[in-house]
Amino acid sequence: YYTEHPITQKVVIKENAYPYNWVRRDQAQTLAEGMNYDGVTSSLIYGVQWDLTLKYIEEKTVEAVEEANKDKVRTDIKRDLISDSTKIGNYNNNLWNITKAKAKYSTNHGNTFNVCLYSKTLSASVLLTTGADTSFSLMNIYDIAGNVWEWTREFCSAKSPCAIRGGSCYLNGSYNPARDRNGNTTRVSGIDLGFRLGLWK
């Protein structure tokens, strides 16, 4: 497994990267820990970090507008993050039109990717490269909602201890918004299971 998935890459935040999926929780943690460099520690993010990221997006979104509009903008962004993330993420029920020339999409579970342009006019499960549309990037944080579930280090429940966050392109954005938390076991992997890591010194 590890010879096929080297962990010597430098971590970057950029558009048009392929989602790293089909990874079990423990594999994701091993990969995340190996993506450190220059004294930086790396790991899967903790649940509290996920929640603080959502709060950061909320506060920065509100800060960016004039005082008269702040209450409405706060209501809207909280709804988008907590109740219905359809319009800010790649979900089954989000009908989008990808116009970024370097973005790619997959209609066969990530086996092959095709170069956009692509317009989704019916509900369908389409996997995208990162940041494929500007609406999926909130404060330069890509795909916090939809596309693939992301493993975190938080505990979920006794039967399904490993938490996944944020929903996926196979689900509905109103049922699995960015704040959503589900549980799985360490043995599970899948097309819509990926991970997000944190870096700190």
Question: Which stretches of residues belong to each language-model region?
Answer:
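Short aromatic-cysteine micro-motif
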Residues: 1-143, 201
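Short, well-ordered loop/turn and helix-capping segments at boundaries between secondary-structure elements
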Residues: 59, 154-157
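Disulfide-stabilized, aromatic/cysteine-rich ligand-recognition loop
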Residues: 19-26, 30-33, 45, 128-136, ...
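Active-site-proximal beta-strands of protease catalytic cores
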Residues: 146-154
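Residue-level signal for functionally critical sites in structured catalytic/ligand-binding pockets
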Residues: 1, 47, 150, 194-196
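Residue-level recognition of short, solvent-exposed, well-ordered loop/turn junctions
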Residues: 143-144, 192
